Amino acid sequence: MKIALDAMGGDMAPQANLKGAIDALDKSKNKELNIILLGNEKIINEFLGNNISSSLSIVHCTDEVTMHDNGSKIIKSKPDSSMVKGITLVKEKKADAFISAGNTGAQMAASLLILGRIKNVKRPGLAVYFQSLNGGKILCDVGANPEVKPEHLLQFAVMSSIYLNHTETIKNPKVGLINIGVEPSKGTNLYQETHKLLSSELTNFVGNVETRNVFDSEANVLICDGFVGNTIMKFAEGCFSTFSEMIREKIMEKTRYKIGAGMIKPALDEIRNKFDFEEHGGTPFLGVNGISISCHGASTAKAIMNSVFLAEKSIKENLIHDISIGIDDHIGVMS
């Protein structure tokens, strides 16, 4: 099993990426696991020093994809970048998966152009995994497709359900449609038509879900267009960040607050760890014909390590094959 890792992508690259790779090899029970590091060979070797393992190999790259690069153009403009080379390794069957904490838009575009789509997939979806009051959930789409049709949202639901089944072993995840009200008549024409389609096609569809219930809804999979999903995701990030800072500032005001905070610190740490993106790692682009995992730009070594484990699990459990079968089950609607 070979996993290609973009050593140069992310805010903490290459240090966090390389340490994450080493930690993954140290902790993995899979003796067949090999990690291909893509990036500047000199920089990689300087960091690795004596930590060179027979399970690590390096592919030298002279180009680097930045956050300002246009994803659809990097294949021609930066063919020797770690991102393009890594995705190409998956295409050529020289790697089983690719991981990057770099430019998400560029990775999505390059993955789609190089790997193509799974047969009958109309639009690949960008999903995000998060914890809630009742376990892990998937929100899809979170930015790849601002404009969609009902059949695209159906495919997002199918692919996300299969992916969550792989990560959380939930056999029949419940699907909810993000909307401004729970009634079927709520929302734009797109969402009304999507509600009808999901109701007829999915036995696990539980109806509309308002954004205030994202974290406590019975739905395990939440579906929406990319504009709505991206807004929800970034608003939630901002709320958590601001709320955490407000608590910290308030605690520092009085001694008794500090004492109280110390007493509940273990509980707060457990909650923080539950919502920590590092625990899950990254998320694969759903619908792309190959495993291409996107990580948070601020990924630490722990996040990279867990992304390697996620890739390993996706490979072992034939995620791409299962998504293909799931899509075929609804092919009549897509025609």
What are these language model-derived features?
Residues 89-108, 186, 191-193, 197, ...:
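Glycine-rich phosphate-binding loop
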Residues 20, 24-26, 110-127, 193-198, ...:
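A glycine- and small-aliphatic-rich helix-loop capping segment at beta-alpha/alpha-beta transitions
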